[in-house]
Amino acid sequence: MGRYSVSPVPKCLLLMFLGWSGLKYYQVNAAQLREYHIAAQLEDWDYNPQPEELSRLSESDLTFKKIVYREYELDFKQEEPRDALSGLLGPTLRGEVGDSLIIYFKNFATQPVSIHPQSAVYNKWSEGSSYSDGTSDVERLDDAVPPGQSFKYVWNITAEIGPKKADPPCLTYAYYSHVNMVRDFNSGLIGALLICKEGSLNANGSQKFFNREYVLMFSVFDESKNWYRKPSLQYTINGFANGTLPDVQACAYDHISWHLIGMSSSPEIFSVHFNGQTLEQNHYKVSTINLVGGASVTADMSVSRTGKWLISSLVAKHLQAGMYGYLNIKDCGNPDTLTRKLSFRELMKIKNWEYFIAAEEITWDYAPEIPSSVDRRYKAQYLDNFSNFIGKKYKKAVFRQYEDGNFTKPTYAIWPKERGILGPVIKAKVRDTVTIVFKNLASRPYSIYVHGVSVSKDAEGAIYPSDPKENITHGKAVEPGQVYTYKWTVLDTDEPTVKDSECITKLYHSAVDMTRDIASGLIGPLLVCKHKALSVKGVQNKADVEQHAVFAVFDENKSWYLEDNIKKYCSNPSAVKKDDPKFYKSNVMYTLNGYASDRTEVLRFHQSEVVQWHLTSVGTVDEIVPVHLSGHTFLSKGKHQDILNLFPMSGESATVTMDNLGTWLLSSWGSCEMSNGMRLRFLDANYDDEDEGNEEEEEDDGDIFADIFIPSEVVKKKEEVPVNFVPDPESDALAKELGLIDDEGNPIIQPRREQTEDDEEQLMKASMLGLRSFKGSVAEEELKHTALALEEDAHASDPRIDSNSARNPDDIAGRYLRTINRGNKRRYYIAAEEVLWDYSPIGKSQVRSRAAKTTFKKAIFRSYLDDTFQTPSTGGEYEKHLGILGPIIRAEVDDVIEIQFKNLASRPYSLHAHGLLYEKSSEGRSYDDKSPELFKKDDAIMPNGTYTYVWQVPPRSGPTDNTEKCKSWAYYSGVNPEKDIHSGLIGPILICQKGMIDKYNRTIDIREFVLFFMVFDEEKSWYFPKSDKSTCEEKLIGVQSLHTFPAINGIPYQLQGLTMYKDENVHWHLLNMGGPKDIHVVNFHGQTFTEEGREDNQLGVLPLLPGTFASIKMKPSKIGTWLLETEVGENQERGMQALFTVIDKDCKLPMGLASGIIQDSQISASGHVGYWEPKLARLNNTGKYNAWSIIKKEHEHPWIQIDLQRQVVITGIQTQGTVQLLQHSYTVEYFVTYSEDGQNWITFKGRHSETQMHFEGNSDGTTVKENHIDPPIIARYIRLHPTKFYNRPTFRIELLGCEVEGCSVPLGMESGAIKNSEITASSYKKTWWSSWEPSLARLNLEGGTNAWQPEVNNKDQWLQIDLQHLTKITSIITQGATSMTTSMYVKTFSIHYTDDNSTWKPYLDVRTSMEKVFTGNINSDGHVKHFFKPPILSRFIRIIPKTWNQYIALRIELFGCEVF
């Protein structure tokens, strides 16, 4: 644990930080200054350290030159001692809410580096990140500290960024160097930052409520991208590879806090697993921590089982590469504090479950039935055995359940198709004991290892990578023909939490060699349940139906039986080249329950049933499996979503309500292999009264499995189809002996019999197997066959369909509205159009091997005003940031969305929506759903065709509670989702609470932005020429694609329109519809946020997984321009970043028309009448001619223009007319245009749906009318265009706003916020009737004595302001004064400043490095404004007059902001 010094906070800071009360049970400590002395230094690092005696013999090939953070004593001469476990990690920084962290940083390395935190409150000169944020050189010293230099970073831990009520005591973040994210990380510059609740830390910085805490970083270091390049890829924990991580120590009954960091410069996922243990993360019980590169998690664990346990990432390539270590739990004599005492009633409910499970070898057919709709390329690659491929049948090993320990009578005679390749379902609730008698009937050693429960070493069933042969016990590897009994109890610490589902989804598998055993087929599902979740039969109480779906990738190349399969199924086994990429790929099978293609049978559910899905990802997969449910949504962890992301070797439990008639698809979203292999269709249908009667009769039996009822004729038909379970010749003898097949190898079907009491036992076994039964009303032979029902035509009994009439979208919408009776119809006109899209600029650090093409033909969605599709709906300021995205489709809960879609592109496209409810005729996606032709016209709209989609917004599509305003989804073309999206056809859907959308179809009182994070791969676009695709050689050597563009909303680096006010509620809707490898971790510099609907959890970064739609809420606390980026370094470097600007909420300052700061030459117009020149258009101007005026002629469009000579923020406009000879002239209505360059003009649209917003003008010639500009305009040129007027178009104007860089508010001279005592001078003039004291030097002060005058007029005089604390001063306005008839003002002056009121420094001219002399006033009443570039950072400032008119007289205002 790192050491640091702690100092009390000054009283003023203490008062500022103590505003957060914290949790009641925390002892509130005084806020502290926690000081760290950290250096970046060179170090030779060995990823695979050898024992000392071996390391002397040979130099390791794994030694690399790294730059690392290390903690030092105060003088940076002596390094602080450190824990060997921390490895490459820098010291762990800790702070409680209310604390300030001061990091004294010194760079001992040879490269400029920095320190940047993922979460903290900091100003611009403590950010540690370099980008174009408009700051001055003095504020950029933190960005990159040169070698040999030092810098002091100051970070504050405020209540706004601290852990929320539901968070753990400390949240985990990372700090790292942000000079070059890719090279800095791969060089080793990273450490952990813990932000903790008030009162949660001990004096030494450790946590109070845990016995131990550990930081583990699972990381992939690419040494070829280190500053000191050396080709190598290292998979490590804390920088240790191949199990060389020092053992993590714990005692039995310890409570451990784990702070886990994932890191890689490329997209990476980690499935962190602690063998034999369970954890709690965000109030959910888990056995695997889902971690992505660039993000961190906090979890806790209570341990009780002693022994040495494996810590690893279960991603297949991580296991093979040696990413593992060990947790060593010892018996330290501690009492058992984890097991609670049970009542007598609870003791009586404890159950002992006994399973008899064997491992058997079979021939498995991955696709016993191949529908004609299967993609032909996929079929040729994976299912056919042409080209000397193995095909779709493989020898495998599976788990099979038996009736008893004799292992002679399987629980099912015929292999249940619905179960697929899975072993039997093992279920248990807390305190239950599970006994598994395992017999190995296979030809090699196997075992059973269970996830999600705490087990003892003798019940673990797993061999570790470093286990010597002599340590391999019988339970770890059960030899062929042997029997071993695994026994374990579900502990209190394993029980699902209050937030969890009744039963949480886990898995079991053989773990002799985990990768090869799973590849061979040995997997099964495990359910760990709450204490009241199961009936005595093992059936879940709170669900109508349970369904298991295991998304497994079987890499047959790693199976134990590869050689057997080559010999049996390849046409020429001796010619097979196992390292041939095509052959290898053909053996990687993407399956759902072991099936690698859709099946002809369709899973059946009853309308309104509540289905509990148990979803698991297993196998040789190194990417996320996104599971998409069409026409319905999952309810998981309190959130409705239609895509669930499964990490390798992890499971999710989700509830689905069957509320949408039709045949729908459950499939994996993403790659071609996944979407074709991992899929099944299911039927949501009403059944006849007879079925319903049967269901009611058996209601009390508690069986909750879906319908597999098969009429006898269907069974007979199925007998003609090859059964998927085909015994090997070696297994035939056993099958015959067991009476499972006859002499000819045909399955034996038992005769029909009357249902008996034994059926209940049979049904309980079906439950254990995860089978789907028809409420107990099925005959035994039908139950044992467990074939799926012949699907009914869901549309045949659908009263909505009349096949004799044409589809009428208005009737469909009307029916929806009549059903709900409280919604509105919202109509959109959207077209698909082809455009040329330019990704340029390529970027500041982009390197490409040949001339980079950045302009590509794409298709986009565009909104139109009506069904003629002649007039596009022009986007305004609110749409400026959307980039390539289609128009935002907004609706409220219970609304109906009607979209008339026209395909103006050259190939078929459609519209497919996520999260909404629709009939099959509005799905916009094509698959074999048994729909009538009438319902298939939506699948693909031909070029120039038109179709109307109707989508309903049920409550599940909208916000889950009152704190959430709107929920985000997406729509896209679903003809070929991958290619359509990469072509550009995608847009956002926002579903809001009732009353949140105004008449212009915009959300009320919400600042919202939609960001789509996507790596566009133009080679996957429909429009990419095949001749331009990357060569095979380029792909094989991993050359960065010339045609991929990481971007936000399709725009690398420079997304525009992200402007907001300080402290306002900003809602960000974040989308990721990329493939399984598209992992983005979103970070907003200088800000933290919460996820909508989950405000109890604080976030510093947000992992954005494939198919994710996340709505987050932020209250920006720091003004300025900030970076929004992905934490995945390689994508960030190539363009997945943007800038957002936070404007001061007081950004409504007069910009200088009335005061004269804006010169006459800066005001121009299309023309004027008489003497009414544009330079007169100044608010409250006086005189005979005091405004701009023009006579409007027919077909002329007059305007007046202000050139602000720099980019500024405009937030409001004040206008006046004029009166001459009692005649009023004024503008009644006008619109505004603006420009950055004076050539390209944009019409301000604001909230209006029309092409421009018409501002209400004046009603007479004297009254001032103020209009608010929202969103704010950032521009140099502003034009006002009068459209309606009285007498003549006439204007007197003032623009309101502030500087783009922010920090430009008045500091208090005019307002009086700066006290009189804080204003001093060298002297001041006294007369018998007045004193011209320094405290009078306030801008626009009125009165006879209204300025500062010195006693004498010479160059030694000065006016001084004490700002009381360090302040950033960005500009100054000076003004003279008039005494009697004497006009007095300062013509030139200089500026001096200091922090200590002792050593004064002159403000220098950056061009000459000499003292800068500023030009002052030219009259006594006008204003002159000067900007300090760079700004002044100081407490004291002096204005020193150099020349003056008549006498020295000053009135001033300073502008800037506080440092903190």
UniProtKB/Swiss-Prot annotation:
Database matches in SMART domains: FA58C
One GO cellular component term: protein-containing complex
Residues annotated for Ca(2+) 1 binding in this entry: K124, E139, D142, D143
PTM comment: In physiological conditions, blood coagulation factor V and factor Va are inactivated by activated protein C (APC) through proteolytic degradation of the heavy chain. However, pseutarin-C non-catalytic subunit (factor V-like protein) retains its full activity even at high concentration of APC. This has two explanations: this protein has only one of the three cleavage sites present in factor V that are targeted by the APC for inactivation, and the binding with the catalytic subunit protect the cleavage site from inactivation.
N-terminal signal peptide: 1-30
MF annotations from Gene Ontology: copper ion binding; peptidase activator activity; signaling receptor activity; toxin activity
Site (Not glycosylated): N385, N1397
Protein residues bound to Ca(2+) 2: K920, F935, D938, D939
Record protein name field: Venom prothrombin activator pseutarin-C non-catalytic subunit
Species this protein is from: Pseudonaja textilis (Eastern brown snake)
